[in-house]
């Protein structure tokens, strides 16, 4: 959530 890094 907030970033697209490993679907967070």
Curated annotation (Swiss-Prot):
The modification Phenylalanine amide is found at residue 8. The keyword Hydrolase does not apply. Keywords: Amidation, Neuropeptide, Secreted. Coiled coil: none annotated. Expressed in the CNS and thoracic perisympathetic organs (tPSO) but not in the ring gland, midgut or abdominal perisympathetic organs (aPSO) (at protein level). The keyword Phosphoprotein does not apply. One of its GO terms (biological process) is neuropeptide signaling pathway. GO terms for cellular component: extracellular region. It is found in: Secreted. It comes from the Eukaryota. Its main location: secreted. Belongs to the FARP (FMRFamide related peptide) family. FMRFamides and FMRFamide-like peptides are neuropeptides. This is FMRFamide-like neuropeptide PGQDFMRF-amide.
């Amino acid at each position: 959530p907030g970033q697209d890094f490993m679907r967070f």
